[in-house]
């Protein structure tokens, strides 16, 4: 995995948002993060961090130069540890919810896909989420 880093202080937030969404959709991109930072002369800027599989590094860097105003990109090769994960469908009444289970040392955790419960009203959303996650973690 390669981490690409750069800062932006001369591109509007709206335009950068569009640019990063396009980058996020590229094959091989694992994650895109942006945060606010302070740069030279006390200027506010966006610090951008992109995780990409090694094989896609060149294409993603080219797209970063195309879509953003950055003049340079730092890259770092990373090793990473990944938990075993699996996806499952849980039925609750007539509704189906996607879940992701992770095998942690000595434990199994489950998270409901937020898009599947987002349509539920507040209290029901939270209780449905808790019920599914508690039920499936015990299996």
Regions found by a protein language model. Name each.
Residues 2-45, 49-139:
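Long, contiguous binding/interaction regions
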